[in-house]
From Swiss-Prot:
Keywords: Late protein. It comes from Salmonella phage P22 (Bacteriophage P22). Pfam families: DUF2824 (PF11039). The lineage of its organism: Viruses, Duplodnaviria, Heunggongvirae, Uroviricota, Caudoviricetes. InterPro entries: DUF2824. It comes from the Viruses. This is Protein gp14.
Amino acid sequence: MITFTPTRNIDLIEMVGNHPDIIAGSNNGDGYDYKPECRYFEVNVHGQFGGIVYYNEIQPMTFDCHAMYLPEIRGFSKEIGLAFWRYILTNTTVQCVTSFAARKFADGQMYCAMIGLKRVGTIKKYFKGVDDVTFYAATREELTELLNNGR
């Protein structure tokens, strides 16, 4: 069973965001600082704490979503991502979700596609004037279709 518990525990959020395995796969490698404008959730998989998912409402009803999974639960990442879509579709009025991954971070790009996000474009030199970033998005209707029909 996968659960999401809202949290504002800054120490926990930054501990996960600055875990060496998270930083190694991050877009800029600088680590993570708590952002008060974001909504954070503790992820538990079968009773085991596994990381943090969060979103920032960047426009009304548009959520920029990200995940920071500890290595112990990464085998459940697809299930967690889909469960998080169910959670926010049920508990919010979100109409569009976005995310992004550095072009050099193939695992992040594959993850976005695996959980139903569509590639919408690339911005060159987005990170520190060096690394390109690929953006992904899906509408509420697209996520609902994915969750209901698996496509």
